[in-house]
């Protein structure tokens, strides 16, 4: 059987050929952990440090296609030292969350967007694509096994990390003939335990996160390691993250590992503008980014707001700040949802970003965070953004 998937990747497209059996959730095998753990107190949950009792693994080979999905006790992987993931970075991942709702159910937030992006990442580095809905079903079954470990309370959730790695043996560089797709989950607490905490950024042009024709719009592990050193260098100068600039124009692209938004005031028209960089192949197609844009276009008054995806520069930000036209700025991502910004270091000066009096965020930042949280925790229904995967009743 030959499974064909045609995926658009930036300015070009790849038709992937996933030979053999398709991914099939009905073939799931479950081996339960004989030593189930008890939920940890919420105050002990640190991002990505606590894991649930089970994991999902699905092998793939070019000859056989997708193998039997297996939910089994969380544990180590056994790989050959020559596996291509170790030598040539055949690796990609996703990040999404599941939430307890007032109806005592557990829902995943927009999993279809994550699966679509994961398939794009896989196709770009010649790893196998898969049937998105089947992986969503399997992830739901994994969550159901450990539903007692999904934390309760505003700001608490279950972080889900689907990962795919090339496992082919040998040191030759080429298309992997074997791969492993696995999913692990981690109970997590609020990114900001005591409410918002605005961050200081260093505008960075000496290092480049992504470039045209590259893979900056894909969620590959290889995109992240090179960004740590510039972050450490910024930290020595008192900044928490890098504001990534690109090109001679110093276009603003992303912040740290997040998409970034700015709010400007047009003093001539009196309208406010929410702006973020366009998806030109250098920007990660963030699910939270898309959620912010969709909600802003749906809920903000178009007579008072313009919502734009356009190029803008650090010079524009600095100039408009001096003119009193910079109103607020924030990053967006799965971990924090929104992360308010208070200062940006550039040319040996700090650009000050306004915050609400006595608070650590701007007005729109606060509103966006509430909109998204209400949907994630089941207080508000919005489209098909929440998918129920377990019932606790």
From Swiss-Prot:
Induction: Highly expressed during logarithmic phase of growth. Down-regulated during the stationary phase. Mainly expressed on ammonium-glucose exponential cultures (biosynthetic conditions), and repressed in the presence of leucine, isoleucine or valine. It comes from the Eukaryota. It is found in: Mitochondrion matrix. The keyword Phosphoprotein applies. Pathway: Amino-acid biosynthesis; L-isoleucine biosynthesis; L-isoleucine from 2-oxobutanoate: step 4/4; Amino-acid biosynthesis; L-leucine biosynthesis; L-leucine from 3-methyl-2-oxobutanoate: step 4/4; Amino-acid biosynthesis; L-valine biosynthesis; L-valine from pyruvate: step 4/4; Amino-acid biosynthesis; L-methionine biosynthesis via salvage pathway; L-methionine from S-methyl-5-thio-alpha-D-ribose 1-phosphate: step 6/6. One of its GO terms (biological process) is L-methionine salvage from methylthioadenosine. Disruption phenotype: Causes delay in G1 phase, slower growth and smaller cells. Lowers the levels of BCAAs and reduces TORC1 activity. The modification N6-(pyridoxal phosphate)lysine is found at residue 219. GO terms for cellular component: mitochondrial matrix; mitochondrion. Keywords: Amino-acid biosynthesis, Aminotransferase, Branched-chain amino acid biosynthesis, Mitochondrion, Phosphoprotein, Pyridoxal phosphate, Transferase, Transit peptide. Belongs to the class-IV pyridoxal-phosphate-dependent aminotransferase family. This is Branched-chain-amino-acid aminotransferase, mitochondrial. It comes from Saccharomyces cerevisiae (strain ATCC 204508 / S288c) (Baker's yeast).
């Amino acid at each position: 059987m030959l499974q064909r998937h045609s995926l658009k990747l930036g300015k070009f497209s790849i038709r992937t050929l996933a030979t053999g059996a398709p991914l099939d959730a009905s073939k799931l095998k479950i081996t339960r952990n004989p030593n189930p753990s008890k939920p940890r107190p919420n105050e002990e949950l640190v991002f990505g440090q606590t894991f649930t009792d089970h994991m999902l693994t699905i092998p793939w080979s070019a000859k056989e296609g997708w193998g039997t999905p297996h939910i089994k006790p969380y544990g180590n992987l056994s790989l050959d030292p020559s596996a291509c993931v170790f030598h040539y970075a055949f690796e990609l991942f996703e990040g999404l969350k599941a939430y307890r709702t007032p109806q005592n159910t557990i829902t995943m937030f927009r999993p279809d967007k994550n699966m679509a992006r994961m398939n794009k990442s896989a196709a770009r580095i010649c790893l196998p694509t898969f049937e998105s809905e089947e992986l969503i079903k399997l992830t739901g079954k994994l969550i159901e096994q450990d539903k007692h470990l999904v934390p309760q309370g505003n700001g608490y959730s279950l972080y889900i990390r689907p990962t795919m790695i090339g496992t082919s043996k040998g040191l030759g560089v080429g298309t992997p003939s074997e791969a492993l797709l696995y999913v692990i989950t981690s109970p997590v607490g609020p990114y900001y335990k005591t409410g918002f905490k605005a961050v200081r950024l260093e505008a960075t042009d000496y290092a480049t996160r992504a470039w045209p024709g590259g893979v900056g719009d894909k969620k590959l592990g290889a995109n992240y390691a090179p960004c740590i050193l510039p972050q450490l260098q910024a930290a020595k100068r008192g900044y928490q993250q890098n504001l990534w600039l690109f090109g001679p124009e110093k276009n603003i692209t992303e912040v740290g590992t997040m998409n970034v938004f700015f709010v400007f005031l047009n003093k001539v028209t009196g309208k406010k503008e929410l702006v973020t960089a366009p998806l030109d192949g250098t920007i990660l197609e963030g699910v939270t980014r898309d959620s912010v844009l969709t909600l802003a276009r749906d809920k903000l008054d178009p007579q008072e707001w313009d919502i734009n995806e356009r190029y803008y520069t650090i010079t524009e930000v600095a100039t408009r700040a001096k003119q009193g036209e910079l109103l607020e700025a924030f990053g967006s991502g799965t971990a924090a949802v929104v992360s308010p910004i208070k200062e940006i270091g550039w040319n040996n000066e700090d650009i000050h970003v306004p915050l609400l009096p006595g608070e650590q965020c701007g007005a729109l930042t606060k509103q966006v965070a509430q909109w998204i949280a209400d949907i994630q925790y089941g207080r508000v229904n919005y489209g098909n953004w929440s998918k129920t995967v377990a019932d606790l009743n």
